[in-house]
Amino acid sequence: MLNLKLRNEFLGSQMPGTAITLRRKDNTGAAQRGPNSILSITYPTADVQTALRAVSTDRSKRPIVLMGDRGRGKSHIMAVMHHAVESSSQVQKWANEWGNRLGAPPLSGLVLDGGFFAISEPVHNHEYPLLWDLIFERHPKGDFFRGKFNQMGRPYPPRSLLEEMFETQPVALILDEFQKWFDGLSDQPGPEGINTGHWPRTSSRIYLSFPRTDRTF
């Protein structure tokens, strides 16, 4: 007998939804709750281990892309990565304990990289038409740098401004359903309109690689 038991949320009269969403209006998204809420329903699969290594001190220092069909657990993994950034000590402890339990040295010896601020958003909800709107709103110093950008009178924030902002507080930007969001972009009309359908393709690395001295994520 395995002595398996259903979790409490499955013992009620109504079955709850099982889809993982990073953020919700009622603040019940996986990125808005404590790390234990997602860790308690997570098994360290090969994909989860790969994702955790990507945010560890041994990471390859390049943007990370999760690809797969709907329902393959990408949002779940992103939620784990969010908390690996925001609550690195708790997630590292969870991973190390699983590593000892499974006899898996990559997990038992995992050391997560701290010091980053996670900005996670399911962008296909179109709450933010431009990525810098999201970054300025969520970054701890976002209001200050948004003011500097507005004073410039430019259609795009320059790279130097973004790098200055990320030097003050390094950021890990986690975007769910990015491709769906990108495919829905359209250019603004007129010669002064922002070419929203073009800038992410040419500048995505600026927004996905944030420097802190010689380190990028």
Indicate where each model-derived feature is located.
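Short glycine-rich substrate-engagement loop in P-loop NTPases that contacts/grips substrate
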Residues: E127-L162
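Flexible phosphate/Mg2+-sensing switch loops adjacent to catalytic phosphate-binding sites
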Residues: H82-F117, F144-Y156, I194-H198
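Substrate-engagement module of ASCE P-loop NTPases
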Residues: R159-E167, G193-F217
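Residue-level preference for the first positions of well-ordered beta-strands
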Residues: K61-V65, A118, P170-A172
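A short hydrophobic beta-strand->loop->alpha-helix junction that borders the nucleotide-binding pocket
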Residues: F117-E127
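Walker A/P-loop-proximal flanking segment of P-loop NTPase domains
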Residues: M1-R72, A79, V85
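Conserved P-loop NTPase "ATPase switch" module shared by AAA+ and STAND
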Residues: M165-G197
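Phosphate-handling catalytic cores of nucleic-acid transaction enzymes
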Residues: D26-N27, S60, S89-N100, P189, ...
